[in-house]
């Protein structure tokens, strides 16, 4: 998917990018490739692949109608090189985006990236989701939490749901069907008062299958969750 294909496909979906937005995606690509030589950000560095498998894939929840251009508080867990939240922010500038990542070098990259792209209302924090999930400044504060290929739902639910307001939504982007994952996550979702409200499949323009699972938070998360860093992965609920 060339940049021109990317712009045209978005226009067909009703999103006509401004010259500023096009420049932001171009700068994003160039900085991603440049910084990838210093720290491991992605295995995908060819321009057409970045536009398809990072940029287009990241904004799929918007294209599929699951997010609006409103000043909602969005948290991205384990965003790595900023996916999916920063492409979403470029497309929908009204979003207020927070990223938590466990690697400080990635936070350095994201901070520089946001400055170069001229993004406002973006916040970056270094640390573990399990620790921030017990912090009152973060717990129960977000309308949406996004996670792209971070962990299976049994683990992901404990890392994300505590951050949501009641009625807030987890938007999980997956490359594989989530049916088996959701079956394994039933107990975790029950304990965390999360309910699957959508399990959506779609295709990238090249025909690759992708999946979006949306979980809504129904009640306050019990205070014992999330457990200490590492435990959700070692001993899933």
From Swiss-Prot:
UniProt gene name: rsmG
EC class (word): transferase
Domain of life: Bacteria
One GO CC term, this protein: cytosol
Function: Specifically methylates the N7 position of a guanine in 16S rRNA.
Signal peptide (UniProt feature, chain positions): none
Organismal lineage: Bacteria, Bacillati, Bacillota, Bacilli, Lactobacillales
Main location: cytoplasm
Protein name as catalogued: Ribosomal RNA small subunit methyltransferase G
UniProt record similarity statement: Belongs to the methyltransferase superfamily. RNA methyltransferase RsmG family.
Protein keywords: Cytoplasm, Methyltransferase, rRNA processing, S-adenosyl-L-methionine, Transferase
Binding site for S-adenosyl-L-methionine: 78, 83, 129-130, 148
GO molecular function, one term: rRNA (guanine-N7-)-methyltransferase activity
EC number of this enzyme: 2.1.1.-
Subcellular location: Cytoplasm
NCBIfam families tied to this protein: rsmG_gidB
